Amino acid sequence: MEEGIDQRLIEKELYAQAEIRLKNQNYSSAIISLETLESRFPFGRYAEQAQAELIYAYYKNFEFEAARSSAERFINLHPRHPHTDYAYYLKGLAAFTDDAGLFTRYFDSDLSRRDIEPAQTSFEDLSEFLSRYPDSEYASHARQRMIYLRNLLAQHEIGVALFYMERKAYVGAIGRANYVIEHLPNTPLTPEALSILIKCYEIIGYEKLMKENLEILRLNYPDYVSTNILVRDKKSWINRLSFGLLGGEKIPMPKKR
C-alpha cells in the first residue's frame, strides 16, 4: 500500500517537474522528464497527457522528426483521444518549419534545385488534419499555414518554369505554369504563370493559345504589369507569399484533459 502511494507521488512529481520546465521553455530538460515519466509509468495517470506534451516539447526544441514520430505514435495508440487532433496538427507543422530568415535564404537559392518535398508533405498532412477535424481549435491556424505552403509550392513551380525557359525548354515551362494554374489556384503566382504561358506560346508560335491566355490575364488581373516576367523585389515576394505567417508563431501546448 505504502509503495503504491510512493509511486504515485513520484509520478506526480515527475509530471510537475516537466510542467515547470515547459513553462520555463527549458525544452531539453522537459523532454527528459516527459520521457522518464512515460517509460516509468506507461499506464499512469499522466501518461497520455505526457505523450501529447512530448510532441510539443520536441517541436519547440527543433527536433522535428522526433515530433512527427511522436505524433504518429500518439495517433496509432489513441485514435479517438481528445488530443488526437493536436497530434495530427503538430505532425503537419513539423514536416516543414522555417522562420523569416530561412524563408529569405530559400529565395536566395535556385528554386529549381530546392527540395520541395517537405513543404508538400506538410501541406498534405495539414489537409488530412482539416478533413478529419474541420472544427478543431487548431483548424484556423492550419488553414493559414496551408495558404502559405500553397504559395511556396507555386513559387517553386514558377522557379522551375523559369529555369526551363532559360534553357529554351518551353514545353517543360508550359507544363509547370499550367500546374500552378490548375493545381495551385488563387495564389499571388497565378498572373506570373499566365505570363509565362503567354511568352512561351509566343515563342513557339502557338498564337491562338497565346491570345487566349493574354485575354485571361487582362480580364482577371487588369492591374498586373509583366516586366520580363517575374522581375520582383525580394521583400515584395516575401510579403506577398508569407502573408505575415512567418516568425513569431505561438504554437499552443495541448490542453489538460
Explain the meaning of each model-derived region.
Residues 1-257:
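Acidic, polar-rich low-complexity tracts and alpha-helical solenoid repeat scaffolds
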